[in-house]
Swiss-Prot record:
GO MF, one annotated term: ATPase activator activity
Highest taxon, organism lineage: Bacteria
Domain J: 2-74
Any Gene Ontology CC annotation: iron-sulfur cluster transfer complex
Protein known as: Co-chaperone protein HscB homolog
Keywords: Chaperone
Length: 174
């Protein structure tokens, strides 16, 4: 299913999330199962299915990584079940530095400062990747779509690192 069509957007990485939320509420009202309480079982089932599609579409388009994956899937590149690893050596070196920094937090004299520095480093790198991703997804060239897939892989990895940093921070606060 093309969620951009469902929510009446042109397929693009940059979308207005306020408009997305508004259209989500409109679609929810239109397909909500309560509206079909007195209809046939088939109509009720269809309403439940449509509600699930609307919910999934909203969650997909709301999240930048999932939105990028969806755009790529519409172009024939499915990242949902892949095991391809990032081969960019610069990124792999940066990844190793971040991993070492995560390990060093536990032994730091000022762990909160180390945590804040890592959050800042993640934010800067993520902004750079997101900019490149936007440019690549707006291109119609096949090679740019493949490059965009690499940016998505990197962003997914960074999301995991961010979650790990949050867990470390939470553990230090306990």
């Amino acid at each position: 299913m093309n969620y951009f069509e469902l929510f009446k957007f042109s397929p693009a990485f940059d979308i207005d999330t306020a408009v997305l939320a508004e259209r989500y509420r409109e679609l929810q009202r239109a397909v909500h199962p309560d509206k079909f309480a007195h209809d046939t079982e088939q109509q009720k089932l269809l309403s439940v299915q449509r509600t699930a599609q609307v919910n999934d579409g909203y969650q997909t388009l709301k999240d930048p990584i999932r939105r990028a994956e969806h755009l790529l899937s519409l172009r024939g590149i499915d990242l949902s079940h892949e095991t391809t690893t990032v081969k960019d050596t610069v990124f792999l070196m940066q990844q190793m530095e971040w991993r070492e920094a995560l390990e060093d937090i536990r032994h730091s004299t000022d762990p909160q400062e180390s945590i804040d520095e890592l959050y800042q480093s993640f934010a800067e790198y993520r902004a750079k990747l997101t900019h490149m991703l936007t440019v690549q997804l707006n291109s119609s060239k096949d090679e740019d779509a493949l490059l965009a897939a690499d940016q998505v892989r990197k962003l997914k990895f960074m999301a995991k690192l961010h979650d790990e940093l949050t867990r470390i921070e939470d553990a230090l606060l306990d």
